[in-house]
């Protein structure tokens, strides 16, 4: 209905000139029209639906359609013209009009155009203003179209009026010409002041006009009546205006602008707006004219002008290109439009209109809801030019131009008014048909839908096709403009509603021509055109003369048949082309809404013709343009080349685009292999193997690697069967990571599996990002992705089974976390320099490529056996733009390595976040454990604050701007202690660490600056000796986790060799010792035994890893029964074959045990620890670290203690470093049984300190990989706090240990500390301690870390262990307090065993207090007591008054005692480490 309304309106406009009703409404009430237009805005919405119904007769619909588009385009055109050059436009228009239509204007004016003109003038003035505004907005493209459409509209309206009134057809056409001229003049005069306000009103006015146009309106009376009933504004013109109005300022302008943008943002309509200068050429004239014609047409023929405008706009786009068409249009704006002059105005108008329509359509189409359907449809018809532009517009425009040329020739031949009008009509019709055929091809599918909802669908269809058409029009604007000028103007009128179908325009024209005899001639050409459309170029010109005869016959008859043709038409276009379908349907719907009776035959014929023409046109558009140029010498020549090129390109472009889309679709599937297309990639990969021939995705991915494999096979082409899977080495976010060997080359690779079964959205976005980013990063320190393979050779199977992709990486033997936790490696300062140098080079490269890694942690730093480091796992990486900082999520980077700005909610972060993570890794390389281990963000921030100081504006001015600054404040203000805590590391490294761990990200050093630091600037990687890495064992995170789990469950792998632990042991052990010493004044010997209970548990954990179930059972029995066993017996029970070293240790242990027995059971514990210490080469200084319960070193002098020690030693012996750990564990467990042994003559605080941290670490390690490397971890586990041991043990073992611990609470604390210290060095070196560091080592930290370390999946187990341990620890606490170790000593008691861990636990307790709860805290407290020395200072406050006291004072006291073993300064360092590292591990 919108189209019908438009047509009706336009017919009213031009037909109104011929019909009395039009003048009365148009001339009588231009103001009323404005009102109507205003009303029509509202009615437009109403009319949208009613228009959809299609009440208006075909004629009325056509008129309404034409008028609406004209109004819309006029508004735009007129506004643009007014802004650009009203005067020039007016003068051009006047000249053209005068040239064309002096006679016509006289006749038309006499007939009824005086009134009509006045009303139209008002409307046009308003419209002109509107159009000018719109044109200004649309500037170039809209102007051209506007001018073309307005001229065409004028011609079309005149012609249409003639067609409407056969009697007054010629008179009307003349009068319409004169009227147009007058209206243009009036418009020009009025447009200045009425520009915008009237442009909107004009829309309404054209509605009135449309309503008034009786001939065509009557033909479309049903629709018109409906529209009229809705106030005439809803009537064809009203609806058209209604649409225009509702959309009018926005839609008309926007639609116009949108169309111009859509078709050619700066093409016709903008040209027109720009065209004041451009007007001078015919193109410019048309543009100028388009505004003035708009005004005129808006007023006099404004409805028609608008309607035609749409068709004209189509040609107008082309005419807009060539000045001559515009000039021609201007000169003969009403009827000369048939000729080049008339065409030029019409085309320019048409261009305006088509754009205007296309905007309306596009708007409508963009929002189907915009159902000012009559207007919409009219716009659709109007929009047909839009269709013309690119898709079918080229072909359609070419044919139309040919028709226009033919029409021009016919017009030239038929100088008579009728002849002129008929030729114009014919060319216009033909051109319209061509255009519309193109449009139809575009719109055909749409048209089918639009039949259902003609208004909406048509609008949408037209809108969609229009942009394409516009492009084509832009290309072949001139031609189309000329063709459209003659043919489209009328076609648009007639086809305003039928825009989609070329038949509709012809039909409308036929109606007009039926009114006139010459127009009748047009009818025959229509059939001719039907066949010619395929020959758009040549056929249209010849047809132009015949066309006039055609209209008379089909004019009225066709209207009734129209409905039947419509369906065929829609069908035909659909079958013909996708382009055609969209076009015909809108027309069909328009026609049906108009009165399907008008051009059914024509519609079907035109549909076919337009389909054929549209399709052939696109292809043969160049050919049609060639003939056309002769017809329109000035414009056509220029247009034809342009059109020819554009039309073919348009079609080809469409096809190519479609092909590209298809190819692109396959590409994403291929991308999975190499590209990051998420949705398609999964299938494509599977598909790609079969489709290998055109795997573009491999090409996409290949460029990065350019390996022989890529030439051999594209990404995704190969199947994972080409690899032999060796084993699992990791677990990613979307699958496992496998170690595999390439069957062809024999090289080792890592296969990262990307599963799609759980992906609802196809390929995981993280995998896509990783693929895209890795393809851009080529650096020796960034892991290299070789290719992508699928797990199914057959694409169908892949799709059916939801297969997976595998990212193929070069294989790296280890990752940093696995090595650190394994305890198998000791990194020297040179090694650390080498690692950091490579890491920072890779990071600096990424940052210079503008990528943020956002997930730097030890497990993502890969090493090979040659000491080469590579940065891996770019799944969280994102492109970073410093200039356009955009917010990203702050939930990135593993918690332990997350910088304070992310914890405080910063979303616009910088590469400094990665530098912080690397600083954490630097500290970890020295401490062998994560320096900040918490399981909650608040706890993590607390740990950072303790080491680096509290975030405050003094040191970090912008911190107050962060979202969580007020909600995440630490419990208290801390000063920066980093240099104190890490005083043991080289000064150059300390300086670098200090800069990398700066709170303020703006002051933090960059990756590039780190490379210039004293620590790294002189590092020459080529001269660095590679570290002695374990070639027999690949140390990966997963392996480390499993190892930890095993240790925790009691099956274990003994702690790692002591070699690595020495450093960590020393530091953490020392710290632990001081804590232990603090609790009891003379706790040197006691500490080792004090910890036996927890130590035993830890030892058991280590032993369990080493021992089988039966051996474990024996050990547990021994521990539980605490029966006296000799060391040899223990060895036998444990099936330990002691090597000479172990035997020596055992002997030493026996001696120690004897001494201890003499002294006390505690001494025995110490002895057992002493052997461990001896293993670690840490002489046990008889420092009694009095555990809470067993402050006396006599407690565990019993054989049971000896047995425990032996068991621990034996278990450690079983494994390379296990013996020491096991001894400790056994001693710890046994000691816990005897409770007596508190004093370890030799095992002193070192061991105790070392042991305790280990104990706690296990608890906290749970988050980390469950166990350290099985063989090397024994000492650490043994050394690990007893609490950690239980954690590592299975529930049964844990329960037994708990019982033992509860019985000998006093004993374990003292004993374990020594053992811990001794074991600790081993553990640290083995990374068993580090393991704990992650999960267990830092008792307190790990307690907290457990959540963090949950990543490592030990978290839950450790937490349970911790909970269980806490019970024991609590007992210890009780015993400690019993012993007189105040509550603060409680911490100390626990500190006893957790030399390293205690501190962590102490800290953890703080965190735990808030997070985990008292039990955990207590358990941590006990375990922590060992670690306490390290963590105590920080943790004490949180552990509780007692703990705090123990930590602060106890630590100080113990510092003296432990100093004996470790040396106070070192211990301080160790302590710092625990705090910084393990201590930090303590969550709180």
Swiss-Prot record:
Pfam families from the UniProt entry: Pkinase
Enzyme Commission numbers on file: 2.7.11.22, 2.7.11.23
Gene transcribed to yield this protein: Cdk12
Function, as annotated: Cyclin-dependent kinase that phosphorylates the C-terminal domain (CTD) of the large subunit of RNA polymerase II (POLR2A), thereby acting as a key regulator of transcription elongation. Regulates the expression of genes involved in DNA repair and is required for the maintenance of genomic stability. Preferentially phosphorylates 'Ser-5' in CTD repeats that are already phosphorylated at 'Ser-7', but can also phosphorylate 'Ser-2'. Required for RNA splicing, possibly by phosphorylating SRSF1/SF2.
Transmembrane segment boundaries: none
Biased amino acid composition, Acidic residues: 72-84
One annotated GO biological process: mRNA processing
Sequence ranges of Basic residues compositional bias: 34-49, 107-119, 215-224, 365-380
PANTHER family attached to this UniProt entry: CELL DIVISION PROTEIN KINASE, CYCLIN-DEPENDENT KINASE 12
Active-site residues per Swiss-Prot or TrEMBL entry: 855 (proton acceptor)
Modification after translation, per record: Phosphorylation at Thr-889 increases kinase activity.
Protein name: Cyclin-dependent kinase 12
ATP-binding keyword on record: yes
Position(s), cross-link Glycyl lysine isopeptide (Lys-Gly) (interchain with G-Cter in SUMO2): 262, 506, 651
Stretches with biased composition (Basic and acidic residues): 1-13, 87-106, 120-161, 183-196, 225-234, 427-455, 483-501, 513-522, 650-662
Modified residues (Phosphoserine): 235, 248, 264, 273, 275, 300, 302, 309, 311, 317, 322, 324, 331-333, 337, 340, 342, 344, 382, 384, 399, 419, 422, 610, 640, 677, 681, 885, 1049, 1079
Protein kinase domain mapped to chain residues: 723-1016
Ranges annotated as biased composition (Pro residues): 524-570, 666-681, 1264-1277
InterPro entries hit by this protein: CDK (IPR050108), Kinase-like_dom_sf (IPR011009), Prot_kinase_dom (IPR000719), Protein_kinase_ATP_BS (IPR017441), Ser/Thr_kinase_AS (IPR008271)
